[in-house]
């Protein structure tokens, strides 16, 4: 019996374990909505939208800009800017340590990426929040990158688009982060005065100081399906008012029904829909489909 264990069974188990470990990590993904197990390469083809239930999964900022902008002519804006712990802030952890961890995990310097480029041949400037970087919170660098993006849009007289995904202002930067609400709102007022279109795309989730400033100041406000959008979270509101909130409260569909946003657009339709919309706004020729 012992010879059989040594000669047959143990090698068989070891081969099985070896085969398991040879399967690359991240090859399969479970949908958080319907729990279907999805093959990652196939999921990427659907832009991280579940083919079973149409749930729009969260995607990182670079992926979002990659699928939105044309491949040619992209230029990143404000890539040299890095956050500084001016207040030497510390809660359960030092702010500088939180920044270092977020930078290591995401490969980004901060929570907003801005690029100039083209949308189906039309010059645009686009920004996207990186929610994985400290919850997409808005601090000095996020505000400054957004302002630089808006200034490039002013200079080129081309539309500005921002994909928001944020928990709000970055508490570790205190008043500096709150100032970004006024700073971003002020530059958007300049765009409006100059007749430059600003489209705000609300993805899951958008809360706090970002929803109370730039995210809700679009000439057109677009929501992704079932995105959570609000100022305070539903749990906080329920605890405050001591009442049960309506079904679907703070979902993009609820906001559309109550006039807080203008439209809901499926991720796969976003490029052509926004290209046609911006073409009409800017009196440009119809965009080239791509």
From Swiss-Prot:
Keyword terms of this UniProt record: ATP-binding, Cytoplasm, Fatty acid biosynthesis, Fatty acid metabolism, Lipid biosynthesis, Lipid metabolism, Metal-binding, Nucleotide-binding, Transferase, Zinc, Zinc-finger
Reactions listed under catalytic activity: N(6)-carboxybiotinyl-L-lysyl-[protein] + acetyl-CoA = N(6)-biotinyl-L-lysyl-[protein] + malonyl-CoA
Zinc finger (C4-type): 31-53
Single GO MF descriptor: ATP binding
E.C. no: 2.1.3.15
Residues at which Zn(2+) binds: 31, 34, 50, 53
Biological processes, Gene Ontology terms: fatty acid biosynthetic process; malonyl-CoA biosynthetic process; negative regulation of translation
Location (main, coarse): cytoplasm
Localization (cell): Cytoplasm
UniProt-listed InterPro entries: AcCoA_carboxyl_beta, Acetyl_CoA_COase_Trfase_b_su, ClpP/crotonase-like_dom_sf, COA_CT_N, Znf-ACC
Activity regulation, free text: Inhibited by pyrrolidine dione antibiotic moiramide B (CPD1); in vivo the effects are not seen unless the efflux MexAB-OprM system is inactive.
GO CC entries: acetate CoA-transferase complex
Root EC class: transferase
Cofactor(s) needed: Zn(2+)
SUPFAM superfamilies cross-referenced by the UniProt entry: ClpP/crotonase (SSF52096)
Subunit structure: Acetyl-CoA carboxylase is a heterohexamer composed of biotin carboxyl carrier protein (AccB), biotin carboxylase (AccC) and two subunits each of ACCase subunit alpha (AccA) and ACCase subunit beta (AccD).
Entry similarity comment: Belongs to the AccD/PCCB family.
UniProt function note: Component of the acetyl coenzyme A carboxylase (ACC) complex. Biotin carboxylase (BC) catalyzes the carboxylation of biotin on its carrier protein (BCCP) and then the CO(2) group is transferred by the transcarboxylase to acetyl-CoA to form malonyl-CoA.
The protein, known as: Acetyl-coenzyme A carboxylase carboxyl transferase subunit beta
Native species: Pseudomonas aeruginosa (strain ATCC 15692 / DSM 22644 / CIP 104116 / JCM 14847 / LMG 12228 / 1C / PRS 101 / PAO1)
Species lineage: Bacteria, Pseudomonadati, Pseudomonadota, Gammaproteobacteria, Pseudomonadales
